[in-house]
Amino acid sequence: MSGFDAVLLVAVLLLALIVLGAVLVGVRAVRGIAGAPRPEDPAFIAEKDRQEQSLAALRSAADEANSTVDAAKSAAAAARTEAAAARAEAKAARAEARRVLDGARAEADTILERVHKQAEADAEQLRTAARRSGEREAAVLATTTREQAAEVERRAARMDDRERLHSEEVERLAERDRQLSAASAALAARESTLVDRDRELAQAEDRRRRELERVAGITAEAARGELVEAIEAQAKREAALLVREIESEARNTGEERARHIVVDAIQRVASEQTAESVVSVLHLPGDEMKGRIIGREGRNIRAFESVTGVNLIIDDTPEAVLLSCFDPVRREVGRLTLEKLVLDGRIHPHRIEEVHDLARQEVVQLCQRAAEDALVEVGITEIHPELVSLLGRLRYRTSYGQNVLKHLVETAHIAGIMAAELRLDVPTIKRCAFLHDIGKALTHEVEGSHAIVGADVARKYGESEDVVHAIEAHHNEVPPQTIEAVLTQASDACSGGRPGARRESLEAYVRRLERIEEIAAGKLGVERVFAMQAGREVRVMVRPEDVDDISASVLARDVAKQIEEELTYPGQIRVTVVRESRVTEIAR
């Protein structure tokens, strides 16, 4: 019995019980009616009506139960029909499965038979292949055996030949031994004869020597000493002549070779750099821009010169202004500041200060980029970042009018060419030459010559001792001890000594202006100092909280007096002390 049949049976039983209960209640109600009091009693009538209603409800419930039972019976019949159909389908499925199983068994038997036949055929092929392989191996083994037998025969023949040759060699050695014995006997006899002759010759030599000593009146030892002294003096003279000739030839050859190397290096470098100028030209989009640069009553040009420390020269030159300053860094910052102001169009004192700060930052970046480009051009890698920053400072540093960074690049190229000609370590020598003036970036901050300062900096940032020694010895503060130091000196001299590289007058002029600024900057309360108008004017910016108006006058006189006492200069120098008070409030 399935689960559905069981549920259906339980439902039928429950309905039957409900119907039975209803019938019993109806029977009890009928009995109550039969034994009830008279119909005239109202209570009886009400009770009767209630019982009739209950009976009617029971009848309707019985009818519903009967209908439910009928539905359940019909559902059970349908379920039995479905179960019969399912049993029929299951029987058909079992028959189909049996048929498929029989077919599979038949197919498996066929496959097994085919596989068995294939296995027998493969086994037969393997047996045939094994038989053929065995035959081939047997043939190869037979061939190898024959070859080995032939080799044994050949070895036996060679052994026989060796034995025969050995016997012949033994016979030859025995014959030679007999000959050597006879020769030894003859030599012994001859040696005895020679000994006797040597004795006789010695006696004759002794007699001759005594006779010579008697005739010459001098002993043999004294004569030997005089002869040795004469020969020694002659040998010394000849050696001295030979040494002088060799030294002269070496000196001439060395000078010629050195001259050839230096000339070749300078020709191959062919630098275009000459002395730096102290004036920069800025082209303007139009002459009307000059009026905006000057400003109302000249306030813009005064503010520009006060902030940058650069002389701004505006003349009749069409669409151009000149910027003059001995300090290349200051001049470049001023040029960039003015260029940005012209492009922006807003030119007033506050804007000049803002753009000046931006220009200074840009110049720092330009210096860093210039140092990196120089390193790439020379071919130097793995250098400390601090050394790169110091090299960038040299982008706007000059020595006797020659740009120091370009001088370092040129010196490195010359040193590399000379090192290659001499077959030396080119990278190390180029590194020595490129870093030899690194100390010039710190001469304003550290006391001492730039060679010693540069050597200390290079040692601090991990450069080798060869590089450090070449730096400290390139101006003979330390005697040069290595070939790297000597080549660094030579390449430095070639770069600085070529025509057009340096100007002594420009260097003296720059030093005079630097000294003027140092004198003014050394006073108490001074914030900034600018040498203007080619040194004919000094503008001193003071801190208003440290210097009052009376002290400003005293400061100007002190600076002028010290300049008169310490410097020699043409004409006059005007000292201008600028004291500016600024008060800023913020409106909220």
From Swiss-Prot:
Gene3D superfamilies: Hypothetical protein af1432. Pfam families: HD, KH_1, RNase_Y_N. GO terms for cellular component: plasma membrane. Residues 278-359 form the KH domain. It is a single-pass membrane protein. CDD domains: HDc, KH-I_RNaseY. Residues 130-162 are annotated as: Disordered. Its EC number is 3.1.-.-. Residues 404-497 form the HD domain. InterPro entries: HD/PDEase_dom, HD_domain, HDIG_dom, KH_dom_type_1, KH_dom_type_1_sf, Ribonuclease_Y, RNase_Y_N. This is Ribonuclease Y. The gene is rny.
